[in-house]
Amino acid sequence: MSIVRMTDLDLSGKRVLIRQDLNVPIDNGQITSEQRITASVPTIKLALEKGAAVMVTSHLGRPKEGSWTEEDSLAPVATRLAALLGVDVPLVRDWVDGVEVAPGQVVLLENCRMNVGEGKDDQTLARKYAALCDVFVMDAFGTAHRAQASTHGVIRFAPVAAGGPLLMAELDALAKALDNPAKPLLAIVAGSKVSTKLELLSNLVNKVDQLIVGGGIANTFIAAAGHHVGKSLNEPDLIPTANQIVADAKTRGAEIPLPTDVVVAKQFLPDAEASVKALDAVDADDLILDIGPQTAQRYAELIASAGTVVWNGPVGVFEFESFSHGTETLARAIASSKAFSIAGGGDTLAAVDKYDIAKDVTYISTGGGAFLEFLEGKTLPAVAALQARGQ
């Protein structure tokens, strides 16, 4: 990958602007999950250790450009960052036209989405960002799919543009999983709708050896195979698409296994009575809310023999205890597998947390939308810009 890496640069005495993803949930001024802040600390520490004058910026929420509000301010983030770094981290409110910072110091630049022109990747604004620094570091993989002034434009105009450790770790892991995977490559794609994961399914079916579908997506594939799905969430108009994806898999010698048993209920409620049924025994008033134990075991065996596992989405309504066993079985199979494993997407990360398997998954992507777009085979604007600068 032809991207200049921050880790390879001499930053001594240099002004370094780092774009991080510090978009954390804040409730009444209190940060409720600091995972992204914690993740950014090693990059900032490294820049300080290398003797740089460090400026860090990020977006937070979706503020109106050109107006400052307390609820959109990075002030709570600055306080937490200072505690984690053990140094003062002043928050600079108006920073586009110049920032005072000395080597060995770090400042946090207020929410970049407050700047007029940020969202539209305004060239004038991007040039102003670039003028602040000797080196620009893009370390926010979670926003790499957005062409904005702080994630794309500035990369074009900064004297030097580099990928930060977090971004590069993410890209290295994704390349290892998709570009040069240890075989067999197994992907788990689950979610409520085929329509939202259509590009993902269509791209992965050309790469994987096995594609396990789950959730509402699986129901559409089950219906496409001629089985009844009762009242289950599914998309009848996408049955031809599902059949095409199955045909594409077959042509390549890949497999899309379907459940042989499922867990059903009459109502979509946490305390609904759960019944395990053979796939052929689903009634007209049944809702399929999880894969059955027999299917979960079969899928777990596929995971055990995989060389690479890409996981995006829980296979059942795992928030409801009675319909969580399929997801838990697969999660534990991934955790105990020797395969290179990568997991990403909000619901997937919630399942990783619920079953406490983070330490057993090779790489956990915090990228969200960027992770999905990469899996869909799309070019991420920030990555393309960094590659162009690395030539």
Curated annotation (Swiss-Prot):
GO terms for molecular function: ADP binding; ATP binding; phosphoglycerate kinase activity. It catalyses: (2R)-3-phosphoglycerate + ATP = (2R)-3-phospho-glyceroyl phosphate + ADP. Its EC number is 2.7.2.3. PROSITE patterns: PGLYCERATE_KINASE. It is found in: Cytoplasm. Pathway: Carbohydrate degradation; glycolysis; pyruvate from D-glyceraldehyde 3-phosphate: step 2/5. It comes from the Bacteria. GO terms for biological process: gluconeogenesis; glycolytic process. Pfam families: PGK. The keyword Transcription regulation does not apply. It is an enzyme of class 2 (transferase). Keywords: ATP-binding, Cytoplasm, Glycolysis, Kinase, Nucleotide-binding, Transferase. SUPFAM superfamilies: Phosphoglycerate kinase. ATP binds at residues 197, 319, 345-348. InterPro entries: Phosphoglycerate_kinase, Phosphoglycerate_kinase_CS, Phosphoglycerate_kinase_N, Phosphoglycerate_kinase_sf. GO terms for cellular component: cytosol. Substrate binds at residues 21-23, 36, 59-62, 113, 146. Monomer. Belongs to the phosphoglycerate kinase family. PANTHER family: PHOSPHOGLYCERATE KINASE (PTHR11406), PHOSPHOGLYCERATE KINASE 1, CHLOROPLASTIC-RELATED (PTHR11406:SF23). This is Phosphoglycerate kinase. It comes from Xanthomonas oryzae pv. oryzae (strain KACC10331 / KXO85). The gene is pgk.
